[in-house]
Amino acid sequence: MSVPSSLSQSAINANSHGGPALSFPFPLHAAHNQLLNAKLQATAVVPKDLRSAMGEGSVPEPGPANAKWLKEGQNQLRRAATAHRDQNRNVTLTLAEEASQEAETAPLGPKGLMHLYSELELSAHNAANRGLHGSALIINTQGLGPDEGEEKAAGEVEEEDEDEEEEDEEEEDLSSPQGLPEPLENVEVPSGPQVLTDGPREHSKSASLLFGMRNSAASDEDSSWATLSQGSPSYGSPEDTDSFWNPNAFETDSDLPAGWMRVQDTSGTYYWHIPTGTTQWEPPGRASPSQGNSPQEESQLTWTGFAHQEGFEEGEFWKDEPSEEAPMELGLKDPEEGTLPFSAQSLSPEPVPQEEENLPQRNANPGIKCFAVRSLGWVEMTEEELAPGRSSVAVNNCIRQLSYHKNNLHDPMSGGWGEGKDLLLQLEDETLKLVEPQNQTLLHAQPIVSIRVWGVGRDSGRERDFAYVARDKLTQMLKCHVFRCEAPAKNIATSLHEICSKIMSERRNARCLVNGLSLDHSKLVDVPFQVEFPAPKNELVQKFQVYYLGNVPVAKPVGVDVINGALESVLSSSSREQWTPSHVSVAPATLTILHQQTEAVLGECRVRFLSFLAVGRDVHTFAFIMAAGPASFCCHMFWCEPNAASLSEAVQAACMLRYQKCLDARSQTSTSCLPAPPAESVARRVGWTVRRGVQSLWGSLKPKRLGSQTP
């Protein structure tokens, strides 16, 4: 609606509820520069208050609050007049605007300032009425007098000149900081009576701020507004009248899904999905267009990646984790909307009742898991793309490429099984199978252990895309096969994960079983329970062929006389035929006496309990004393051929080694409180006994050698 350039005196009197008539001491139609001339300003007398300046001396004094408000307005007018500025301008303009205003030296014509003085007149009347009655001003613009009609006609002529001024001022507003109010250019008054309420404002604002003042920072959306059109150079707010956008450029209809907006610009009307930034020509409720028909590319493709976990030996596994990009899916009722050119096609075969009848037959075997899928094709991959840290990005690129491809699904060059028709993906035992649902024809069988990588699409609208990478049997080429699933693809990934866990468990059990069967059964005969023991060390065992003379109890654990007495008693009481041919096995821990023919154990003695050993008076005799119990000792006697030197040395070495082990074990434990006997004493005692026996042996042999050498 056109704005009146001035208001009639009768309308002002009607609004002031019968108050006194207002008169102005200065001409309203005079030139602005004439009123603001430096000479006139020097000789002019500033009125004391706003009412005296407006010619209302008879009006009673207003209240304290109104007086303060009027005083602030008066100060602003005085500062504006002193600075030679437009009094209808807001005093809070930036320094850049002040500099641009001072640079304009050409005076404005009186015709260009008529509208500004009319606004000042309107502001003054409103301020006077507010101070008198303390109520809101009601302006009736219906009944205009002849004076108002003339001024209105003049104002309409002036609007053409003001349009050019508004364009210049808008360019200044673009360069000025946000948050500063724009200058008053137009006062818009409704056609009917309207109450202009005074909200909470600062008292320092002038009266011109009460009408039509626009804030350039009205909202966060306007302050950072950027046009979405490809060819639009405008950076202004959509509220600007000269902006590239019209007021109805953005529409959110109730028939659109949540998150969608209808946008209108010079390129036409298209639909914008706010969370993802995707745009399309067709409404989102209809069949989605291909990417080539979209006015602009997707602004962002979100990829959160797959969780790389330990898989089986021949491949990797990605576990589907909760996506952090969940807010990006807001507003998409159907994840397939606005994504694929074939999304409107049904993935279930027709008719539906027949499909439901076939489901029990498909899942008749509980060990088989079926999933309705559609092959999107395959993409060749390299070993470098499957490297750790790069495989997830490579597979996601394959999913994007095959999901957005522009070729027809029925194109045989797409490389998909079933020529783009519905298929059944079956997980049976350890095999992934692709079966035609109609005649149950097997199209492809892939061993699960040969799958290198599999994953689920994580982009917005890609929750039903499943892909796996395996090597082709014929070409030995790595191929990434992508499928569009009827249900969320994470169900397939979970099932594959369970199968892989089962395969790994079976392999571990089989490996343990093979390791157990590889053992020598002859060594496990005497073991009551098959338990894994540490592998024993192979100890050196020496065997000697002797005659076992038997064992007799003795009174003392040590002494050569004890051994000689036992040997003499046995030799005198028995003959050679009564002696038992035997084998003596000498080990570092045990001395074992076995029968030569029957291999029966005649005696087994622990080396740790051996107390004394010696060679008898006859070099063929050897004996040692063992502790059979507390204060109980036994002497074992042998007849050796050709002599007892080798057997005595072997038993002595076993005693030395065993005693050294006992010393090492006692030094590591602190529980024992008994002092360890010196090693020299034991070694000296055993060595002295053996040395004495050897000396006696050599002494018996020496006379024979000397006698043999004499002629």
UniProtKB/Swiss-Prot annotation:
GO terms for biological process: apoptotic process; axon guidance; DNA damage response; DNA repair-dependent chromatin remodeling; double-strand break repair; extracellular matrix organization; negative regulation of cell cycle G1/S phase transition; negative regulation of neuron differentiation. The keyword Nucleus applies. Residues 365-533, 538-700 form the PID domain. Brain, not in liver, very low in other tissues. The long (neuron-specific) form is expressed only in brain. Keywords: Acetylation, Activator, Apoptosis, Cell membrane, Cell projection, Chromatin regulator, Cytoplasm, DNA damage, Membrane, Nucleus, Phosphoprotein, Repeat, Repressor, Transcription, Transcription regulation, Ubl conjugation. SMART domains: PTB, WW. Residues 140-257, 277-300, 321-364 are annotated as: Disordered. It is found in: Cell membrane; Cytoplasm; Nucleus; Cell projection, Growth cone. Component of a complex, at least composed of APBB1, RASD1/DEXRAS1 and APP. Interacts (via PID domain 2) with APP (with the intracellular domain of the amyloid-beta precursor protein). Interacts (via PID domain 2) with RASD1/DEXRAS1; impairs the transcription activation activity. Interacts (via PID domain 1) with KAT5/TIP60. Interacts (via the WW domain) with the proline-rich region of APBB1IP. Interacts with TSHZ1 and TSHZ2. Interacts (via the WW domain) with histone H2AX (when phosphorylated on 'Tyr-142') and the proline-rich region of ENAH. Interacts with MAPK8. This is Amyloid beta precursor protein binding family B member 1. The gene is Apbb1.
